[in-house]
């Protein structure tokens, strides 16, 4: 008897399903992957598709066979002498292939799992990563990531130019073309520029001053002079589906002394990571080295005045078909391997100064890392 992986989802939202099939569809479909003997990326891949999608799947999907859902449903109906459910159709396929053991992702439907167990199948939830090979990127994937990154850098440059060309008002707010320069306006510019480059941005962060002390505050309202403005931009390419992630922090006017010191410390934190990252290194060691550097410079982390301040998030994360993927570069142990693409995004956040974060993307190599990001890191604009 064989063991197979089973996915029932839409590949527009399910990155594992898109990774395995390279077929994009907005409605759920059935995918069965009979693994190779060594558990690698090989094996036999089968799609079970509706009449609506079967011909497109045959021409676009990177699988071994595409079967008709309607035909399997007809066979199941004859066997059961009743209208079949989706799980009856799955059973029809698996029984014909002598498959009785199934691996499913942790977010697989409980109702589907129960129905399969009632039909005598062994169903095991496979912990993430469902496809571990997703963590190490191919040359094609790195090219896709870089393509999205270049588009993001161009959009970010347009946003920074707007801030640079704005005028400082007596109340320290910024105006451009006679209108207030707001977080919403910069976000709109970023999204429009990315759309022109076939990228889609969501939850883009444009946070100024105290708002930026909360790293995931998307930001709102007027942008102000002499305060750090954090822009964290992470779109997905509409065609390739691969993400990019970049953060830059700028100040219009003159940055206070503490902000300058924070900026320099964060840049040095990145340099520490670049010197340490290579094949076989534990990401937690990289994270600790940056924390130690911040502490040595007097930038302490912990709860202060009722809120977290300092450096209280991870140094980085993998990305690809999802914005956050394994591995993590954080306090958790994760061994980095050549071919992984991770972000390097240390930050410092204090209520009396605002937030500073700088983020690049790097490829882990045998002896170090290759920085993919090319955008300049300039505080004063």
Annotate each PLM feature.
Residues 1-381:
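Active-site neighborhoods and metal-handling regions in enzymes and metal-associated proteins
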């Amino acid at each position: 008897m064989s063991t197979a992986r089973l996915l029932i989802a839409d590949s527009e939202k399910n990155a594992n399903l898109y990774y395995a099939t390279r077929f994009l569809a907005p409605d759920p479909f059935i995918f069965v992957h009979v693994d190779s003997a060594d558990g690698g990326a090989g094996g036999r891949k089968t799609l079970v598709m509706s009449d609506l999608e079967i011909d497109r799947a045959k021409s676009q999907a990177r699988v071994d066979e595409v079967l008709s859902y309607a035909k399997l449903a007809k066979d199941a109906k004859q066997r059961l002498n009743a209208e079949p459910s989706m799980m009856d159709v799955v059973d029809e396929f698996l029984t014909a292939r002598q498959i009785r053991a199934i691996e499913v992702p942790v977010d697989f439907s409980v109702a589907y799992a129960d129905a399969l167990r009632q039909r005598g199948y062994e169903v095991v939830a496979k912990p993430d990563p469902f496809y571990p090979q997703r963590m190490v990127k191919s040359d094609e994937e790195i090219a896709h990531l870089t393509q999205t990154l270049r588009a993001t850098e161009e959009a970010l440059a347009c946003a920074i130019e707007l801030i640079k060309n704005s005028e400082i008002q007596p109340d320290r707010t910024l105006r451009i073309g006679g209108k207030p320069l707001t977080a919403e306006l910069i976000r709109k510019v970023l999204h429009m520029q990315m759309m022109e480059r076939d990228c889609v941005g969501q939850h883009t962060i444009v946070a100024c001053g105290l708002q930026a002390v909360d790293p995931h505050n998307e930001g709102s309202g007027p942008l102000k002079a002499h305060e750090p403005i954090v822009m964290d931009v992470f779109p997905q390419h509409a065609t390739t589906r691969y993400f990019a992630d970049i953060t830059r922090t700028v100040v219009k006017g003159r940055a206070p002394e503490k902000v300058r010191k924070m900026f320099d410390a964060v840049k040095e934190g990145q340099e520490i990571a670049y010197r340490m990252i290579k094949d076989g290194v534990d990401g937690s060691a990289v994270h600790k080295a940056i924390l130690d550097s911040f502490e040595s410079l007097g930038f302490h982390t912990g709860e202060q005045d009722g809120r977290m301040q300092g450096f209280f998030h991870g140094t980085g994360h993998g990305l690809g078909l999802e914005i956050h993927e394994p591995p993590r570069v954080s306090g958790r142990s994760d061994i980095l391997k050549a071919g992984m693409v991770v972000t390097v995004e240390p930050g410092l956040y204090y209520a009396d100064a605002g937030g500073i974060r700088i983020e690049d993307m790097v490829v882990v190599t045998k002896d170090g890392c290759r920085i993919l990001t090319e955008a300049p890191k300039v505080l004063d604009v």
